[in-house]
From Swiss-Prot:
Name of the protein in its database record: Probable malate:quinone oxidoreductase
SUPFAM superfamilies: FAD/NAD(P)-binding domain
The reaction(s) this protein catalyses: (S)-malate + a quinone = a quinol + oxaloacetate
GO MF: 2-hydroxyglutarate dehydrogenase activity; L-malate dehydrogenase (quinone) activity
Family annotation (InterPro entries): FAD/NAD-bd_sf, MQO
EC number: 1.1.5.4
Pathway connected to this protein: Carbohydrate metabolism; tricarboxylic acid cycle; oxaloacetate from (S)-malate (quinone route): step 1/1
Keywords: FAD, Flavoprotein, Oxidoreductase, Tricarboxylic acid cycle
GO biological process: tricarboxylic acid cycle
Organism of derivation: Bacillus cereus (strain ATCC 10987 / NRS 248)
Cofactor list: FAD
Membership in a protein family: Belongs to the MQO family.
Gene that encodes it: mqo
Enzyme class of the recorded protein, top EC level: oxidoreductase
Keyword Acetylation: no
Length: 500
């Protein structure tokens, strides 16, 4: 056992896409800072960022219907869709900067062009999709989107989905070719490979046991070296907790006022994966449907082409599951251990409020393989049971907190940064849109935690991310220029791959 304190400038907890992004930004902005990373698992990007543990959608609201809500008068509120799209553009720009600067290579290993489509059935839903298409088409971020309710067009766009369909129920789809499939696991590993060349100390199989404030205002992180069994103590001026579902328990250990009255509810995801390559080759898009009435936002069904290890795959889901673990590799005591005197009422209030979610999860857990196949056949009528296996994806911990709008124990479905008033420590909580908006979220961490540095850093940030602080919606020419240039750098504008 070692009680020696080892000092550093920055500690990043968790080797996922968020820590990888923050570390990469900091190494460009403050190259002299010493950074240490602690990860419980044996390598980077193995939990939520792993390619099998998330949907791999470059979330930019091109096809996700839950980002566009219908108002009482039938008009469509696109504000959330615009926000998510603007945030994804920041990620695209930063990734393109890294590729252009040769800090990471071979972008086709982590991002591929792929049409994003929305698909609905029923007269009311067709009208909703048409209204959505018309509202989004007025915005430059969504240019190139097409709408069709003509069966012949749908057969061309969606051959696998339309084959064997006997229902006369009206159907419609939108299609936009500027969508992407992102392998966040591969990207995370690339970023940590780059950070290693910049002398960032990567410590795998190191579990953070405690975080506490020292008398001189630093943060002391107690770390268990799982290789040697030793306990280490590291201190830093700034700590980022980017441990996915494991972030909430660590945030609670800090004791900062901002960590109080926050709870977490874990939801696990399952996907069906097609093992018949002939079927896989018949589909080429991410196709998002509409969540069923009463189902939570994370239940939106989608049929996705994926590129994993440079091989085409086909996944359908998600189906929800329940586990009290906050991480896929976590403990069954995670949920009960997160209940504290300061959040127990918040958690209980959520339990009463969210009976619909509880009922939904119970129904999902009880589904047999054949019942899941029935849901899949709503997308692929001719789907055969023997062609599909189930894979368990990652855990997502939905944030529960008290809000002015929702009252006590309100379930949050977004991604949220919680930081100390003095900016010395920050944690990332929540789920979707998550990894797609990593650059936006980590810029938010910089703004909250290093406000005195932002004027000094602004020039470099704008070199890396040209639309930082600018609305692309209000600057369509800039959007077009950046979309074209980042697309060229990332190999998204043409079919051939980019090697550099």
């Amino acid at each position: 056992m070692s009680n020696m304190q080892q000092k550093t400038d920055v500690i990043l907890i968790g080797a996922g896409i968020m820590s990888a992004t923050l570390g990469s930004l900091l190494k460009e902005l403050a190259p002299e800072w010493e950074i240490k990373v602690f990860e419980k698992l044996a390598s980077a990007g193995e939990e939520s960022s792993n390619e099998w543990n998330n949907a791999g959608t470059g979330h930019s609201a091109l096809c996700e219907l839950n980002y566009t809500s219908e108002k009482s008068d039938g008009s469509i509120d696109i504000s959330k869709a615009v926000k998510v799209n603007e945030q994804f553009q920041l990620s695209r720009q930063f990734w393109a900067y890294l590729v252009k600067s040769k800090l990471i290579r071979n972008p086709q290993d982590f991002i591929m062009p792929l049409p994003h489509m929305s698909l609905v059935q029923g007269e009311k839903n067709v009208q909703f999709l048409k209204n959505r298409f018309e509202a989004l088409s007025k915005n430059p971020l969504f240019q190139g989107m097409e709408f069709s309710d003509a069966p012949e067009t749908l057969k061309k766009w969606l051959p696998l989905i339309m084959e064997g369909r006997t229902s006369n129920e009206p159907m419609a789809a939108t299609k936009i070719d500027s969508g992407t499939d992102v392998n966040f696991g591969a990207l995370t590993r690339m970023l940590f490979d780059y950070l290693k060349t910049k002398d960032v100390e990567l410590n795998y199989k190191h579990s953070v046991e405690n975080i506490k404030r020292t008398k001189n205002g630093l943060w002391e992180v107690k770390v268990h070296d799982m290789n040697s069994g030793k306990i280490e103590h590291h201190t830093a001026k700034f700590v980022f907790i980017g441990g996915g579902g494991g972030s909430l328990p660590l945030l609670q250990k800090t004791g900062i006022p901002e960590s109080k009255h926050i709870g977490g509810f874990p939801v696990s995801g399952l996907f069906m994966v097609c093992k018949n390559q002939k079927v896989v080759e018949q589909h080429h898009a991410k196709v998002y449907g509409k969540a069923k009435v009463g189902a939570p936002p994370m239940s939106v069904p989608h049929l996705d082409t994926r590129y994993i290890d440079n091989k085409k795959a086909l996944l359908f889901g998600p189906f929800a599951g329940f586990s009290p673990k906050f991480l896929k590799t976590g403990s069954n005591l995670d949920l009960i251990g997160s209940v504290k005197p300061n959040n127990v009422l918040t958690m209980l209030a959520a339990g009463v409020k969210e009976m619909g979610l509880t009922k939904y999860l119970i129904q999902q857990v009880m589904l047999s393989h054949e019942k899941r196949m029935e849901e899949l056949r709503e997308f692929i009528p001719n789907a055969k049971s023997e062609d599909w296996d189930i894979v368990v994806a990652g855990q997502r911990v939905q944030v529960i907190k008290d809000t002015d709008a929702g009252g006590k124990g309100t379930l949050q479905f977004g991604t949220e940064v919680v930081s100390a008033a003095d900016g010395s420590i920050a944690a990332l909580l929540g789920a979707s849109p998550g990894a797609s908006t990593a650059v936006h979220v980590m810029l938010e961490v910089l703004e909250k935690c290093f406000p005195s540095r932002m004027v000094e850093w602004e020039g470099k940030i704008k070199e890396m991310i040209p639309s930082y602080g600018i609305s692309l919606t209000e600057n369509p020419r800039l959007f077009q220029d950046l979309h074209t240039s980042t697309g060229r750098t990332l190999g998204l504008n043409e079919k051939e791959t980019v090697h550099n």
